[in-house]
């Protein structure tokens, strides 16, 4: 089956980038945004760029010139490598515009004295941060382990060596933020740490910075876990392909080949590529020679290996398990399935949900409020609560308490609350489900109704032609004086015309007609021109149709629904006769019907479709566990629609719908029922309804490009079992996000209150604060697990699992007793 063309939705967020000759950019990790960096500037502004290497919080500052990105490179390989460089570091970094004059001056000064280079070095070596933390801990235990005369000297030595390891980069970060008018978590922590030093508590200040860095290293580890599937996909993307050299138009032969290794992005459509055992198919292609056993588990989650033989379509990224084959590229690297999956998943991570957008706006203002409150406590505390301004042996001072509030109230835990969205997106990608943004999960969780298209969605879409029946305008008889069209010839003529009109179509009815015509002795029909009417049918001018009395000539042919064909007849009496003939058909009403009209002769094409395996279970799950209102929206007639509906368990059916009717039904039902509506389809006829629905879901393997473009969720597997998974995952994600926000606020309160009251030291405040942040991260990672509808369902599944194991255990016991 041909892989889907994953078309980027026009609704996807685009990130503007300012242009300027002397624009200074500060690229660093922002705890309130997780966006992929993009370097799309056509000018060459000076900027500070970020490179995240081993330590997740290590941000490399350097002055570079932006890459001229207009795709006119002299060396394509260099361009390709440049892309991979940015992809490698793009999971959790964002470029912040830093155009203020103070920032430029500060950076120039820092660069001149080597501050930038030293900060880069310290950030890139994780062991230095760990060493600093170890030195601070050693200084803390010196009073208990070291001889008394050496305590002060050892503590000073540890502090002098350890503090610069964490303080150099922290001070540069904070000063750059302050110079740009930013007040964030880095500024708050740096202020608290250096204020502690000036107050004589250098040990606590050092511990604060060390624990902050280590905690955020752990935080970034959990954040990177959410992107692990995308990374694996990108790593499985081959860098090169074995391009077969074709000389003088000769057809390549698998037994005698001449090939060379070329960069994968240089493989053109129509090129021949050799794929051996263990290799990855570089681009979407068609097997030309040979055969192989392939797996696409990492693309769609489909575990079962597939056999690929000549003529089969294979998606880029498929792994060749066994065999050797020549494939012909059908798409370039940029348009191939694997690259599109990576693109869509990365864009889904970058399309921020409502909560994260709110946190982006809230974060900076919140940090400023924390600074104001801290200053108020520092200066008003001595007057209101009789605290000393600086700490004494008997009481912690107001400045110390203010620093504790500054640390405890930092919004780190709130900032990582949306991490649950990232884990959900990766979990869906692992199952072969692509979401066009985290906001889709919020929308999906709010839906109370789900509507399914019938043909190709609830059914296999593999329609089979059962009969061709002339019903109107055909003359029969043996009298030679009457212009006759004997029935066998009419059936052949009708099939030939219909197959010619539907050649190359993706519609299930059209595919069934074309498949039925293969291998049959049919007259040659040529389509001169045609016009398509979405959801109704098509008309064409055909050549090659002959009668007994005359040679072939151009004739008008129409193919589509009964209503479409009857609407083309001017006489109401003729339309009624055709409808009566359809109702009186000896084949009954349960089949799917298509009608063909050629010069007022109408032929009925009877087709049969079967429900997909497992669809009834999906519908039952959506009804009983998801509590969704389930309905069918189809363009088929009522008897065919109800036959499928009864088979799968749907009790609400709307049939004989044109695309505009489906669109209106979606709008009206969503408005009347309240809440959102999910539309599941795959054809171009479903595109308007998919676009109007709260969430549109398509089966990507057989969907039209239009349906894919407007859909919010793409199911890469060719079944709808992913629909209940999506609904359950959305509800799990919204629940996790709510839990994260509650945990974040609780951790802030529990760390801030005792700190302001003077019950805990500054280093313990940091520990409580960062502990809350790590707790939120750990809770978010739960989103990588499969969701469940409720704890009751978990218990039912556990009981069923135990019951299924009982016969096995009893039989094993009987065998052992027999021995």
From Swiss-Prot:
So where does Mg(2+) get bound? 682, 686
Q: Which residues form the active site?
A: 453
User: What's its EC?
Assistant: 7.2.2.12, 7.2.2.21
Tell me which Gene3D superfamilies the record gives.
Answer: Calcium-transporting ATPase, cytoplasmic domain N, Calcium-transporting ATPase, cytoplasmic transduction domain A, HAD superfamily/HAD-like
GO molecular-function annotation terms? Answer: ATP binding; ATP hydrolysis activity; metal ion binding; P-type cadmium transporter activity; P-type zinc transporter activity
Compositionally biased intervals (Basic and acidic residues): 66-79
**Membrane spanning segments where?**
123-144, 154-173, 181-201, 203-223, 362-384, 399-416, 738-757, 763-781
EC category name: translocase
Annotated GO CC locations = chloroplast; chloroplast envelope; chloroplast inner membrane; plasma membrane; plastid
Q: Which UniProt keywords apply?
A: ATP-binding, Cadmium, Chloroplast, Magnesium, Membrane, Metal-binding, Nucleotide-binding, Plastid, Plastid inner membrane, Transit peptide, Translocase, Transmembrane, Transmembrane helix, Zinc
Look up the transit peptide and give its residue range. 1-17
Where does the record say this protein resides?
Plastid, Chloroplast inner membrane
Which ranges of this chain reside in the Lumenal compartment per its record?
A: 145-153, 202, 385-398, 758-762
- Enumerate the catalysed reactions: Zn(2+)(in) + ATP + H2O = Zn(2+)(out) + ADP + phosphate + H(+); Cd(2+)(in) + ATP + H2O = Cd(2+)(out) + ADP + phosphate + H(+)
Query: Which residues, by range, are in coiled-coil regions?
Result: none
A single GO BP term for this record reads: intracellular copper ion homeostasis
Superkingdom in the source lineage: Eukaryota
Describe the task this protein carries out.
Involved in cadmium/zinc transport.
In which family does this protein belong, per the annotation? Belongs to the cation transport ATPase (P-type) (TC 3.A.3) family. Type IB subfamily.
**Which PANTHER family does this entry report, sorted A to Z?**
CADMIUM_ZINC-TRANSPORTING ATPASE HMA1, CHLOROPLASTIC-RELATED, PROBABLE CADMIUM/ZINC-TRANSPORTING ATPASE HMA1
Name used for this protein in its record:
Probable cadmium/zinc-transporting ATPase HMA1, chloroplastic
The organism encoding this protein is Arabidopsis thaliana
Q: What is the lineage of its organism?
A: Eukaryota, Viridiplantae, Streptophyta, Embryophyta, Tracheophyta
């Amino acid at each position: 089956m041909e892989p889907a063309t994953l078309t980027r939705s026009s609704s996807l967020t685009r990130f503007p980038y300012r242009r300027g000759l002397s624009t200074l950019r500060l690229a660093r990790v922002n705890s309130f945004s997780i966006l992929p960096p993009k370097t799309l500037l056509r000018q060459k502004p000076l900027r500070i760029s970020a490179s995240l290497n081993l330590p997740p919080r290590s941000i490399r500052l350097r002055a570079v010139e932006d890459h001229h990105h207009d795709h006119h490179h002299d060396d394509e390989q260099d361009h390709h490598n440049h892309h991979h460089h940015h992809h490698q570091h793009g999971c959790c970094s964002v470029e912040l515009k830093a155009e203020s004059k103070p920032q430029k001056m500060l950076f120039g000064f820092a660069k001149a004295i080597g501050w930038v280079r030293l900060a880069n070095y310290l950030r890139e070596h994780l062991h230095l941060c760990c060493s600093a933390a170890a030195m601070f801990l050693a200084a803390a235990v010196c009073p208990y382990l070291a001889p008394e005369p050496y305590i002060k000297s050892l503590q000073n030595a540890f502090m002098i060596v350890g503090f610069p390891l964490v303080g150099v980069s922290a001070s540069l970060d904070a000063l750059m933020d302050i110079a740009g008018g930013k007040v964030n978590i880095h500024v708050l922590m740096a202020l608290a740490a250096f204020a502690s030093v000036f107050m004589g508590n250098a040990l606590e200040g050092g511990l604060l910075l060390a624990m902050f860095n280590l905690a955020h290293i752990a935080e970034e580890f959990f954040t990177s876990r959410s992107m692990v599937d995308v990374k694996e996909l990108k790593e499985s993307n081959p860098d090169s392909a074995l391009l077969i050299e074709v000389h003088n138009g000769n057809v390549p032969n698998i037994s005698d080949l001449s090939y060379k290794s070329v960069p994968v992005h240089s493989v053109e459509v129509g090129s021949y590529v050799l794929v051996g055992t263990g290799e990855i198919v570089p681009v979407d292609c068609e097997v030309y020679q040979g055969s192989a056993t392939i797996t696409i588990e990492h693309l769609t989650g489909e575990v079962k290996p597939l056999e690929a033989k000549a003529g089969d379509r294979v998606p880029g990224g498929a792994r060749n398990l066994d065999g050797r084959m020549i494939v012909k590229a059908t798409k370039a690297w940029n348009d191939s399935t694997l690259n599109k999956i990576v693109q869509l998943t990365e864009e889904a991570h970058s399309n921020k949900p409502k909560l994260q957008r709110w946190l982006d706006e809230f974060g900076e203002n919140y940090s400023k409020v924390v600074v104001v409150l801290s200053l108020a406590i520092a200066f008003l505390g001595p007057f209101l609560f009789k605290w000393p301004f600086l700490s004494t042996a008997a009481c912690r001072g107001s400045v110390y308490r203010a620093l504790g509030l500054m640390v405890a109230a930092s919004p780190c835990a709130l900032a990582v609350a949306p991490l649950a969205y990232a884990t959900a997106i990766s979990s869906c990608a692992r199952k072969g489900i692509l979401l066009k943004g985290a906001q889709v999960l919020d929308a999906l969780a709010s839906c109370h109704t789900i509507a399914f298209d019938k043909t190709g969605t609830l059914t296999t879409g593999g329609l089979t032609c059962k009969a061709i029946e002339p019903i109107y305008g055909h003359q029969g008889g043996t009298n030679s004086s009457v212009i006759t069209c004997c029935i066998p010839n009419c059936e052949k003529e009708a099939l030939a015309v219909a197959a010619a009109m539907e050649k190359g179509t993706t519609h299930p009815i059209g595919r069934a007609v074309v498949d039925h015509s293969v291998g049959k002795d049919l007259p040659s029909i040529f389509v001169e021109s045609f016009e398509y009417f979405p959801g109704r049918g098509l008309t064409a001018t055909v050549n090659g149709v002959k009668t007994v009395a005359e040679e072939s000539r151009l004739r008008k042919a129409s193919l589509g629904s009964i209503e479409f064909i009857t609407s083309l007849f001017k006489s109401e009496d003729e339309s009624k006769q055709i409808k009566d003939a359809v109702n009186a058909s000896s084949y009954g009403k349960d089949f799917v019907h298509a009608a063909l009209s050629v010069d007022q002769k109408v032929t009925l094409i009877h087709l049969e479709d079967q429900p997909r395996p497992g669809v009834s279970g999906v519908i039952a799950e959506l009804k009983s566990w998801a509590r969704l209102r389930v309905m069918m929206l189809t363009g088929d007639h009522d008897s065919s629609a109800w036959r499928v509906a009864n088979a799968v368990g749907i009790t609400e059916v709307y049939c004989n719908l044109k695309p505009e009717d489906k669109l209106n039904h979606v709008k009206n039902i969503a408005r009347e029922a309240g809440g959102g509506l999910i539309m599941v389809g795959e054809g171009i006829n479903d595109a308007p309804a998919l676009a109007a629905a709260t969430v549109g879901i398509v089966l990507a393997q057989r969907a039209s490009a239009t349906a894919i473009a407007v859909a919010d969720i793409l199911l890469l597997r060719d079944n709808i079992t992913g629909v209940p998974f999506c609904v359950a995952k959305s509800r799990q994600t919204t629940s996790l996000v709510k839990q994260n926000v509650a945990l974040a606020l609780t951790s802030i309160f529990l760390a801030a209150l005792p700190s302001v009251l003077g019950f805990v030291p500054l280093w313990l405040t940091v520990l409580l604060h960062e502990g809350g942040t790590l707790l939120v991260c750990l809770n978010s990672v739960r989103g990588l697990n499969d969701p469940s509808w409720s704890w009751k369902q978990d218990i039912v599944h556990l009981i069923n699992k135990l019951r299924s194991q009982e016969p096995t255990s009893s039989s094993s016991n009987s065998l052992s007793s027999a021995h």
